Amino acid sequence: MFDRIWFKSSFFYLFLLPFSWLYGVISTLNRISYQYGWRKVYRFSVPIIIIGNLTIGGNGKTPMVLWLVEHLKRRGWKVGVISRGYKGKSNNYPIIINMNSHSEECGDEPMLIWKRTGVSVAVSPKRADAVAALLRKQELDIIISDDGLQHYALFRDIEWVIVNSVLRFGNGCWLPAGPMRERINRLHTVQAIIANGSEVGIQSGEVLMQLFPIAVVNILTGERKPLYFLNNVVAIAGIGYPTQFFDTLRSYGIIPIRSISFSDHHVYSEKMLTSLTKKDEILLMTEKDAVKCIDFAHDNWWYVHTEVKINKIDTHNLLSMVENKIRYYKGSRYNVQ
């Protein structure tokens, strides 16, 4: 319902405007309370980069985190990642993800990052606690925060904002009348605006990132096959914008028998998923969904492995920005407050 109000012409947003104004006042007061030193901002001895967004929902933050982690690892830097661990529930924070961790505790996106990259990932609602936990565990050159643009208690050196190149900012209103966590003018203060999707809708000065499916992977066995390997597919997606996943499958020649959408961060059960397919049908999902199903996966369950592609010039510029900050920290005598 909210998507129709936010991203399509609908007068219903007018009824929600008073609540949006209240949200805007609270959001603004929260930000300036840190900017003017009324509340403590936590700083650390390594650079922090935030990869976040201005709107609610999935715009591609986690794929961009994966892209950056993998590039920095290849260049020899020691990288850590922190996350709020949205929808994860635990009695003990911070959590440093390990072989015994479950997505129900730490969240699906942190688990995906850990499984895909192997770097240290810490989860806590208080991101400064997650940073401190990582630095106690090992020496790092940089820490990347998956989301957290509005978490001003954590000092950040670099901010990248991910934008859906098609949906953009909808009607531009604060929550709940619109999708905005902060106003669009916040983009003037970030170091990079990265548009996820197609060149259609991209604005001047923005970096284009595109997600390409590389292979399908069996959740139970880890077997990898080319995209065209699967037939009789039932596709599911519990992400911010499931239709984008289904559209991508069709564009690569995978035409699902059925396409089933779930809410973002949906919690699956074995009984629920087995009921979705008949004999000789394949259940195909996103990698983010797959990390929640590993413990009870069946041999006909597969996920799509995707990778971010960014052109060489923008890749060079983004990595130079980050590496220059790492070198600055290594060359300075930085005092932790």
Swiss-Prot record:
This is Tetraacyldisaccharide 4'-kinase. Pathway: Glycolipid biosynthesis; lipid IV(A) biosynthesis; lipid IV(A) from (3R)-3-hydroxytetradecanoyl-[acyl-carrier-protein] and UDP-N-acetyl-alpha-D-glucosamine: step 6/6. The keyword Isomerase does not apply. Pfam families: LpxK (PF02606). The keyword Acetylation does not apply. Keywords: ATP-binding, Kinase, Lipid A biosynthesis, Lipid biosynthesis, Lipid metabolism, Nucleotide-binding, Transferase. Belongs to the LpxK family. One of its GO terms (cellular component) is plasma membrane. ATP binds at residues 55-62. It comes from Blochmanniella pennsylvanica (strain BPEN).
